[in-house]
Design a protein with these regions (language model features):
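Bacterial N-terminal signal peptides
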Residues: 7-17
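Acidic, low-complexity intrinsically disordered segments
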Residues: 20-176
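N-terminal secretory signal peptides that target proteins for export/translocation
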Residues: 1-3
Length: 176
C-alpha cells in the first residue's frame, strides 16, 4: 500500500521535473512587437542590438511592424561604412506566398542601402508584422555603430498609395 502511494506520486512528479526545460529565453523573436522600440506602424531592426568580433559576419533583419494592407516596401538603411560592410541582402518571409516577391537591393558602399520588396502575385497585400529582408554585414573594426531606417522609407498599398509610417527604427552593432 505504501509502495503504491510512492509509485502514484513519484512517477508523475519525476516526469514533471524531467520534462521541464529551462532553456534560454529567446529575446530576439522578430514577431514579438515587445522587442522593438519603434512607434507603430513602423519599420525596425531585429535584433536592435547585435554584437560580434571584428571580421565576423552577422545577420540583421528588417521587419515591418503592425502594418495593414501592404503590397510593397522601400526600406532605406543608413549605416557607418567605416564600421560595417554589407555582404548580402535576401528577402524575408513577410511577402512570401505562392510566388516569391520581387526583391531588389542597392548598396552604394558609402553608408546607404536601399531595399525594395513587393508582391507580383494575385495575393496582393499582407498585414501584420514580419521580416522583409535579412542582411549579412561584416564587422570591419572594433567599436559601436548605428544602423537606422530613414524617413525616405515607404510602405505602399496595391494602388501605390503610401501607408503612413510612425516609427523608423535604429539598431546598434558592437564589434569587439
Amino acid at each position: 500500500s505504501q509502495l503504491r502511494w510512492i509509485n502514484l506520486l513519484l512517477i508523475p512528479f519525476s516526469f514533471l521535473f524531467l520534462s521541464c526545460d529551462l532553456g534560454k529565453v529567446e529575446l530576439d523573436n522578430c514577431q514579438d512587437l515587445g522587442n522593438y522600440t519603434v512607434d507603430l506602424p513602423g519599420i525596425g531592426f531585429c535584433p536592435e542590438l547585435s554584437t560580434g568580433s571584428v571580421n565576423d559576419n552577422i545577420e540583421l533583419s528588417i521587419s515591418v511592424l503592425d502594418i495593414t494592407d501592404a503590397a510593397g516596401v522601400h526600406a532605406q538603411v543608413n549605416y557607418d561604412a567605416s564600421m560595417v560592410k554589407i555582404i548580402s541582402a535576401d528577402p524575408g518571409d513577410f511577402f512570401l506566398r505562392s510566388q516569391k516577391p520581387i526583391f531588389v537591393y542597392e548598396d552604394d558602399g558609402q553608408g546607404k542601402l536601399d531595399i525594395y520588396v513587393f508582391f507580383m502575385s494575385s495575393e496582393k497585400t499582407n498585414s501584420g508584422t514580419g521580416q522583409i529582408a535579412d542582411i549579412i554585414v561584416k564587422l570591419l573594426q572594433p567599436g559601436s555603430s548605428e544602423v537606422s531606417i530613414t524617413t525616405e522609407s515607404e510602405i505602399l498599398d496595391p494602388k501605390d498609395v503610401k501607408i503612413p509610417i510612425k516609427g523608423f527604427g535604429t539598431g546598434t552593432i558592437n564589434a569587439e
